[in-house]
Amino acid sequence: MSKLLLLALGLLAASPTLAQTASPVPTGYTLKAPTDFDQYQPQVLETVAWLSNPTTPFGTSDRAAANRFLIEWISGSPTVSVGVEPYVMELTNKDSDLLTAFLGGWASYSLQHPNEKDPVVLNMEATKTVLAVYKNKGGKGNKTATELIKLNEQGKLPEWVKAHLSRK
C-alpha cells in the first residue's frame, strides 16, 4: 500500500511539470477573417509564455508548431504590427527560436498593452523575450545577446535599444 501511495504522490508532483510542457497551440485553427485572429489572442499569449518557459524543450515538433502558429498569427493579425529593426537580425543570429521570441514578445506585449505605441518600449519588451529564450538555450555563442543580458541587468537596455532604432 505504501508503494501505491508513493506512486500517486510522485504522479501528483510531476503533473504541474507535465502540464507546463503541453503545447498551447490550438488544433485545427483557421486564420483568415479578422475575428479568427481575435479569438486566438489568448492562445497567442499562452504560446509566447510556453515558448519562453525554461522547461519547454527545443527542437521538438511541438515547438515548431508553436513557432508556426505565432508567425501565422502575427503575419495576418489586424491588431498587432511588429517592427523588425536591423539590430534584430544580428541579435537573433539566424536562430529561428530567437526570431520567433522577438516576434512573440512584441505581440504579447502589444496584446497586453494595446495603447502602447512607443517603439523603444515595444522593442525592449521583445528583446527581453529574446534574452530569456537565449538563456534557456544555454546562453552561448551570441555576443550581442550576451552583451544585452549584461546591459539589461545594469538597467541600460532602454538606452541601447533607443540607440539602435532606425527611427528615433
Predicted feature residues:
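Sec-dependent signal peptide hydrophobic core
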Residues: 5-9
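Mature extracellular/secreted ectodomains of secretory-pathway proteins
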Residues: 61-167
